[in-house]
Amino acid sequence: MLARLKKIQQKYQNLQQDLLQNQSISNKINIFKNLSKLEPIVELFQQYLTLEEQLTNITKALNQDQIEDKEILELAQKEKETLSQQKKVLWNQLRILLLPQDPEDQKNVILEIKGAVGGNEANLFAADLLRTYMKYAESKKWKVEILNLHPSIKGGLSSVELLISGQNIYSFLKYESGVHRVQRVPATEVQGRIHTSTAIVLVLPEAKEVEIKIDWNDIRTDTFNSSGPGGQSVNTTKSAVRLSHLPSGISVACQEGKSQHENKEKAFTLLKARIYNQILNAKQEAENKHRKSLVGTGDRSEKIRTYNYPQNRITDHRIGLTLQKLDIIMEGKLDFIIEPLIDATQKEKLVQSE
């Protein structure tokens, strides 16, 4: 690993030298991209080397009995212990930075939320989750575009599909896929009984044109009257669009746009993501990571997370994390959950790499 770090350091220095040469704009852009990827590793490695030098010097002084003052000697020994611990921490951080990255992590995502088991209460919870994700996206300065929205009675949502754009979005939101279980007293419950219901969240990496090629001859396009916010033309013109990909059997519809052209573009974005996800799932199936294990059917027993409102408690069952701050997290503070999930994933990868 040390040799690999030195190679990365040398590559970083070479790229810096390349910037001084008479490069084209496109070359400079690529160099800056590569530098930005390597910079966190190089900076941390430099900290590690500096700390290692300090540790070597103090160890040498202690071994050669160069310190005669007893009080200074005790301080030096404590300093050595502190530096040794810091060295271990930096080394583990470097190991994490060198772990293979998920190639999807830097992508935008399609986020889908559906009410599942529990009727209208499930749909109300789906609306609450949408609000949480919108607030989280706002805190990260991500752009959110609604592709499809199907409201239900009393302010609930039967389903919603969003396109979320920004930096490294999939690396954060990929942990949200699965069954989310809620335990609370519905507003309509006169006897105060706690009801359990679920919503399904699905997070798909957005597919780019270079990653997936779709022949329009394989797509059937249907138009129908929109029930969305299309102004006066709603229900009078066929602005809503349904795209059906015949080879895969995947069909998507979009009606949130104000024109047929806009809805067709949004539907195609959604269709690409679903086809791309199907391709990814085919690969994962070979590794026993089929999509159903990720998302499930919505049954209460398949939950990845439980939201207990009476006790203000949220539990992520994948890592056994329980927090008594449900109210805060539902205001968009999802990093309280997502960061421990990222840490757990990194630790698992470290164990696998040993």
Swiss-Prot record:
One of its GO terms (molecular function) is translation release factor activity, codon specific. GO terms for cellular component: cytoplasm. The lineage of its organism: Bacteria, Bacillati, Mycoplasmatota, Mollicutes, Acholeplasmatales. The keyword Transmembrane helix does not apply. Belongs to the prokaryotic/mitochondrial release factor family. It is found in: Cytoplasm. Signal peptide: none annotated. It comes from Phytoplasma australiense. The modification N5-methylglutamine is found at residue 232. Peptide chain release factor 1 directs the termination of translation in response to the peptide chain termination codons UAG and UAA. This is Peptide chain release factor 1. The keyword Kinase does not apply. Methylated by PrmC. Methylation increases the termination efficiency of RF1. InterPro entries: PCRF (IPR005139), Pep_chain_release_fac_I (IPR000352), Pep_chain_release_fac_I_sf (IPR045853), Prokaryotic/Mito_RF (IPR050057), RF-1 (IPR004373). Its main location: cytoplasm. Keywords: Cytoplasm, Methylation, Protein biosynthesis.
